[in-house]
């Protein structure tokens, strides 16, 4: 196993942060906590429902971790949308994270996908069953064009996760494969399309800007995610089909060369994003910039990406990149490091326990009504 290229990673991260002029001022601390609480409470209540528990069969602990990650991503990044949309997107993207972590073979339950879709029958695949039920709650916030992007991108994501089940890097010489898979499972169009709710934007009036933003966001957000995920995925056996490692196999290049390719693509995409929209409607640019800065803050602060380990590693490194990275990290940490205990409650486990207690109390009450003499004796004994 090669050693993680710490110095190179620091230089890459610093260049990215400088390119986008990173300065997350999306919220006051109180606003951030309030939005986190609102989105989490609605999403946790959704996933604690008996139907979701029975169909998903995901452990409450894993579900809790997924919820906290996704609620953070949505609240930090979608800073310009309503709290209600934040909550609905949090539910949708939690479903996608659950699928991304799944190891179940979808083939048997997808045999009648289109037939069921055409005839209006429920889907056989449990994930599609639940996602389709929730989709109207998401789509009600958008016009038809943005809605179509969300639907299509979610379908692509499912197929991308299906492909990843095979841990296939692409055949040597198949240079198009890594980008094909990453665009498919990156949710870029879903993310790009969900920045423009009809409450804030008339999609007909801003059609060209929205279309261009979706096109640019498709690559930017997945490449930034790949850069920020590179450390956590470096030695994780579950993440061996990352974009960087697929470049290594398909193009026959070294890991450092593949990382450099990703770095250059990400930096170029960041520059394009800033240049293309800097002269457009200020409201469009503000939405994009707030998303970019919030998305980076989320990566730097969320435990899933383990970037605090990189920060800790650099404390004894006095290079320019190391010092700049520490400064950026501390800036992000100051605004984005909020303990889940401040907003993620009641937890999914607590909600499930509460529901069980209420169901037991209801059963006891029904039993007492069915057998009043026995209940009266019990009351006398208790007295």
UniProtKB/Swiss-Prot annotation:
State which pathway it belongs to.
Sesquiterpene biosynthesis; trichothecene biosynthesis
Q: Which UniProt keywords apply?
A: Lyase
> What processes does the entry annotate via GO biological process terms?
sesquiterpenoid biosynthetic process
As its record notes, the protein acts as a catalyst of: (2E,6E)-farnesyl diphosphate = trichodiene + diphosphate
From what superkingdom does this record's organism come?
Eukaryota
Family per UniProt?
A: Belongs to the trichodiene synthase family.
The record's function comment reads: TS is a member of the terpene cyclase group of enzymes. It catalyzes the isomerization and cyclization of farnesyl pyro-phosphate to form trichodiene, the first cyclic intermediate in the biosynthetic pathway for trichothecenes. It serves to branch trichothecene biosynthesis from the isoprenoid pathway.
Record-given protein name: Trichodiene synthase
Organism encoding this protein: Stachybotrys chartarum (Toxic black mold)
Q: Which gene encodes it?
A: TRI5
